[in-house]
Amino acid sequence: HGEYRRQRQMCIRDRSLTLFEKIINKEIPAEIIYEDDVSIVIEDINPQAPTHLLIIPKKVIPKLSDASNEDQEILGHLMLVAGKIADQLNLDETFRLVVNNGAKAGQSVFHLHLHLISGRPLNWPPG
């Protein structure tokens, strides 16, 4: 078991950083709207609406389905940040939060993030 653990730690240590980790680490620039100890909010570089923000936890959770019980506080925090940002931007309770889980659902960066979308009619069902 010791060798397995050592190799697993090497894989974790040697993996390349996601785009969001590089933004969180200030290695690449982004339009930061909000930041606290747990999360960061940036403008989407490919907006699908007049307002399209990404709410990203600083802890790396690849997909929502990878979240564990210990992530409950982080997940709740992301929702509260979304509400706070929507209020600050005067979105008048007219916005949508989206989480894509996995490539087939449209997830392109494997670091959990919420899309906050507003500023145009949002049809149902989405997609």
In which residue ranges do the predicted regions lie?
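Conserved His + Asp/Glu catalytic blocks
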Residues: R13-R15, L19-I24, I117-G127
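N-terminal first-folded block
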Residues: R15-T51
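Single conserved hydrophobic/aromatic residue that forms the stacking wall/gate
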Residues: H1-I12
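Short histidine-centered catalytic/ligand-binding loop motif
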Residues: I55, K59-I74
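C-terminal structural segments of small proteins and small subunits
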Residues: D92-P125
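Long, well-ordered alpha-helical scaffolding segments within enzyme catalytic domains
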Residues: Q72-Q88
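Divalent metal-coordination and catalytic microenvironments
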Residues: K26, V41, P57, L78, ...
